[in-house]
């Protein structure tokens, strides 16, 4: 896995919440592909296929892991570097487009809900400074039911400015933060 993923378990008001954070492979070419073969790898959509491998592994080790079968409260979030069929009305990709593989797996093989897509149906809310949503927050049904508010933060503190030091880098970051408030009663 590159860049990586982690699971954290926190207890709030007697509830154990399992939080999965991740950042999947960011390139169009496959992981470990040498520079001479990167164009061919990208043409074969190997970056998308590697991200699918990553999310299958992450789900198998966390939300779908029998060791966690008794755990109901889950959040999964991060930079997925992929598109979701929940936004495909906006993108217009073919249904079998490899850019949709990651979220197809989550939506078809877990009970996690895409917080932003569920809260704002029919609205496309970019998580980057362009017109892409590649950053997501998912919640299990028990956590989704406790959402008070959720939004993608777009304010003066999250407005990108090009770095004076690196031509393809932006401050503060290329993805915008997703903020969700939950009501956790005992």
Regions found by a protein language model. Give the residues of each.
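Extracytoplasmic/cell-surface-exposed regions of Actinobacterial cell-envelope-associated
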Residues: 8-11, 56-59, 66, 113-115
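Metal-dependent phosphoester-hydrolase catalytic domains
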Residues: 64-75, 82-186
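Beta-strand elements within well-structured catalytic alpha/beta cores of enzymes
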Residues: 19, 75-76
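Active-site metal-binding loops of divalent metal-dependent hydrolases
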Residues: 24, 79-80
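A short secondary-structure junction signal
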Residues: 20, 30-34, 86-90
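A long, amphipathic alpha-helix that forms part
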Residues: 42-70
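A solvent-exposed, charged loop/short amphipathic helix patch at secondary-structure junctions
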Residues: 29-49
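Structured beta-strand-rich core segments of catalytic domains in phosphoester-bond hydrolases
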Residues: 1-29
């Amino acid at each position: 896995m590159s860049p990586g993923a982690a699971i954290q378990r926190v207890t709030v008001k007697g509830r154990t919440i399992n939080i999965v954070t991740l950042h999947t492979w960011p390139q169009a070419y496959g992981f470990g592909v040498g520079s001479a073969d990167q164009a061919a790898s990208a043409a074969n959509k190997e970056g998308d296929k590697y991200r699918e491998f990553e999310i299958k592994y992450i789900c198998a080790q966390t939300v779908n892991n029998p060791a966690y079968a008794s755990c109901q409260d889950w959040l999964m979030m991060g930079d997925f570097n992929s598109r979701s069929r929940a936004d495909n009305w906006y993108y217009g990709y073919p249904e079998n487009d490899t850019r949709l593989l990651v979220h197809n797996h989550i939506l078809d093989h877990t009970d996690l809900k895409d917080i932003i897509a569920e809260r704002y149906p029919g609205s496309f809310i970019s998580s980057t400074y362009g017109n892409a949503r590649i950053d997501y927050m998912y919640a299990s049904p028990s956590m989704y039911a406790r959402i008070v508010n959720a939004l993608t933060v777009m304010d003066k503190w999250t407005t990108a400015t090009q770095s004076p030091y690196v031509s393809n880098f932006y401050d503060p970051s290329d993805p915008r933060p997703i903020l969700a408030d939950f009501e956790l009663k005992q």
